[in-house]
Amino acid sequence: VRAHGLSTERGGIQNIITQEPSVAAYAIGSGAQAASTVFVVDDDDSVREALQGLLTSVGLRSRAFATAQAFLEYDEADTGATASCLVVDIRMPGIGGLDLQSRLVQRRRVPPIIFMSAFGDVAMTVQAMKAGARDFLPKPFRDQDMLDAVCSALKYDEQMRALEKSRESLEERYRSLSDRERALLQMLGDGLMNKQIASRLCLSEITVKVGRRQLMQKMRARNFVQLIKMESLIRGLDSQKVRASYEGGANEVAYRLESAIARVLHE
């Protein structure tokens, strides 16, 4: 196994790049991963060059930045159309890795982050992982360990993007409903019978039945059970707890809800 073990003694400005015998090309899991981008943020030129060389050797695209500020400026203008992950040195002059992670959380969903450091301690690792980091690699590290971490992060980002598309699809369907249709959907979700709904909305039962059929069409539900599941998920999206979770970046609550949405929409 070939290793780009990278360690940096900043006090003595001594960079060590160890290499073992090379290996066969690392297999990328999917075409989607090959089209993904790995962002490298490290103030050490040799580290950036070594990582970009490693990623290029297995067919992965990368962009490197010497400072977190430079990445933030790029990220603000980037549309983020394809899956990506971030490989970041946790200790850098100016904005450090943990601070960068915090700033990204404030902007939007954070891409999977792989932290690396020659100086990382247990407390720092715990802080990074609690904030949502995917991995933490100490320098020096093996090429294979970095590639495994990167490919795992890219696969995770692809999955999260697919889940987000399912959520956006459900929200788009719900936005297409009129106020009365939304009220009808909520009452159906509450378990009310057609007669009860007709009484509350001052409608005939026939009109309620027609409204149900229209709801099925607009929500693209294949059956009534699926429609009720969609209504339950919409309530979850509207809850303050989940809304707060999106504002704070990806977390377990949002992930479980989006996974449920994806399952229901593909039933």
For each of these PLM feature ranges, what is it?
Residues E73, L98-R109, Q127:
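Short amphipathic alpha-helix used as the core "switch/output" element in two-component signaling
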Residues A66-T67, P93-L100:
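Acidic catalytic/metal-coordinating carboxylates
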Residues Q214-E267:
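Basic, Lys/Arg-enriched C-terminal extension of HTH/homeodomain DNA-binding domains
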Residues M193-Q226:
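Recognition helix of helix-turn-helix DNA-binding domains
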Residues A34-V47, L51-L55, A68, L86-D89, ...:
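Conserved acidic segment of CheY-like receiver
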Residues D121-A123, L137, F141-C151, Q196, ...:
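C-terminal output helix
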Residues A64-C85:
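Acidic, metal-coordinating helix/loop segments flanking the phosphotransfer/catalytic sites
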